[in-house]
């Protein structure tokens, strides 16, 4: 097989791999405060994750992203990065992190071959940061960003989930922070995954509203740039080195060009973030430890069932009970 093609004719060249459901934060949009995590036997081993990645890269996937939970709380993560970075045909090995562990891990990750880092940063206010993350320390994340730049990472992007009443008023300040640090930043519409104990519809902030906030202070230039993910980009006329992205699952969904799949840490291959359609790869991995044929056949059949689009609603109703940390955030 040379290409993974789904039932809509879309080429799949991007796989997100969740290496853990655990996290040292409890972000309000990601999980419940009293989240219960998976027992070890239900979690894929690093060897199983590597095996899946190897199969997909051999079949045409060119970009892998390691996610969580927080991937840096998984023991052995640096060694996994080193092995994945060496896969023939892989062009990009990326990671999404909350940044709290990067003072320790930035240099080892860079040396292991990680090519890109996305770092979550929803606010620059320490008290708000603790409220959104429920227990996080902003200073650790800011130090982690510094450590990543010092380690040599040149392709660092900040991710901010924008919520009215929590951090929407900080959009301009976050842009200014990205400019000052020479970083890109993407603003994300909150996704209705899991019961998080509050009304999402009341805090929903669309990408168009975020763009309008930025345009009050900066002249924007639309860009046709693509990163292999769902973001639409603009450049700042006076600071063209900073790229601003908008990830808009509600207001400007990107389903028609969807090129990605997600593997959860329990081994479910999610065909769409907004649907429960999935393939139990863990069972196949453990039933066929020496033979890839059954896995390849099952993946090919599953791809034909990948939905044309999600059904997310900006009204805030939960369409998927699975939490974001269980989905590969």
UniProtKB/Swiss-Prot annotation:
GTP binds at residues 16, 65, 96, 157, 260-262. PROSITE patterns: MOAA_NIFB_PQQE, RADICAL_SAM. Pathway: Cofactor biosynthesis; molybdopterin biosynthesis. Keywords: 4Fe-4S, GTP-binding, Iron, Iron-sulfur, Lyase, Metal-binding, Molybdenum cofactor biosynthesis, Nucleotide-binding, S-adenosyl-L-methionine. Its cofactor is [4Fe-4S] cluster. One of its GO terms (molecular function) is metal ion binding. S-adenosyl-L-methionine binds at residues 29, 69, 120, 191. [4Fe-4S] cluster 1 binds at residues 23, 27, 30. Binds 2 [4Fe-4S] clusters. Binds 1 [4Fe-4S] cluster coordinated with 3 cysteines and an exchangeable S-adenosyl-L-methionine and 1 [4Fe-4S] cluster coordinated with 3 cysteines and the GTP-derived substrate. GO terms for biological process: Mo-molybdopterin cofactor biosynthetic process. InterPro entries: Aldolase_TIM, Elp3/MiaA/NifB-like_rSAM, MoaA, MoaA_NifB_PqqE_Fe-S-bd_CS, MoaA_twitch, MoCo_biosynth_MoaA/MoaC, rSAM. It holds the Pfam family Radical_SAM. Its EC number is 4.1.99.22. It is an enzyme of class 4 (lyase). SUPFAM superfamilies: Radical SAM enzymes. It catalyses: GTP + AH2 + S-adenosyl-L-methionine = (8S)-3',8-cyclo-7,8-dihydroguanosine 5'-triphosphate + 5'-deoxyadenosine + L-methionine + A + H(+). HAMAP family: MoaA_B. Belongs to the radical SAM superfamily. MoaA family. Catalyzes the cyclization of GTP to (8S)-3',8-cyclo-7,8-dihydroguanosine 5'-triphosphate. Monomer and homodimer. This is GTP 3',8-cyclase 1. It comes from Pseudomonas aeruginosa (strain ATCC 15692 / DSM 22644 / CIP 104116 / JCM 14847 / LMG 12228 / 1C / PRS 101 / PAO1).
């Amino acid at each position: 097989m040379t290409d993974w093609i789904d039932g809509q004719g879309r080429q799949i060249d991007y796989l997100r791999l969740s290496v853990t459901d655990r996290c040292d934060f409890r972000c309000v949009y990601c999980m419940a405060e009293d989240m219960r995590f998976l027992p070890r036997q239900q979690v894929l081993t690093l060897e199983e994750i590597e095996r899946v990645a190897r199969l997909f890269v051999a079949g045409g996937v060119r970009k892998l992203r390691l996610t969580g939970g927080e991937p840096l709380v998984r023991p052995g993560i640096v060694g996994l990065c080193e092995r994945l970075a060496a896969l023939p045909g892989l062009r990009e090995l990326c990671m999404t992190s909350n940044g709290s562990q990067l003072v320790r891990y930035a240099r080892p990750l860079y040396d292991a071959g990680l090519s890109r880092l996305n770092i979550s940063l929803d606010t620059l206010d320490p008290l708000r940061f603790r409220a959104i993350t429920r227990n996080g320390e902003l200073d650790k994340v800011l130090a982690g960003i510094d450590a990543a730049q010092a380690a040599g990472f040149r392709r660092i992007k900040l991710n901010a989930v924008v919520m009215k009443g929590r951090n929407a008023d900080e959009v301009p300040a976050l842009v200014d922070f990205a400019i000052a640090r020479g970083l890109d930043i993407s603003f994300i519409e909150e996704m209705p995954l899991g019961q998080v104990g509050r009304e999402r519809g009341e805090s929903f902030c669309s990408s168009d509203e975020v763009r309008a906030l930025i345009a009050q202070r900066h002249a924007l230039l639309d860009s046709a740039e693509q990163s292999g993910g769902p973001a639409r980009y603009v450049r700042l006329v006076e600071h063209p080195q900073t790229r601003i992205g908008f990830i808009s699952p509600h207001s400007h969904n990107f389903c028609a060009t969807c090129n990605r799949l997600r593997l959860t840490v329990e081994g479910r291959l999610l065909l769409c973030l907004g649907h429960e359609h999935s393939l139990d790869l863990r069972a196949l991995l453990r039933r066929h430890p020496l033979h890839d044929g059954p896995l390849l056949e099952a993946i090919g059949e599953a791809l034909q069932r990948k939905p044309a689009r999600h059904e997310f609603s900006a009204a805030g109703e939960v369409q998927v009970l699975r939490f974001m940390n269980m989905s590969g955030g």
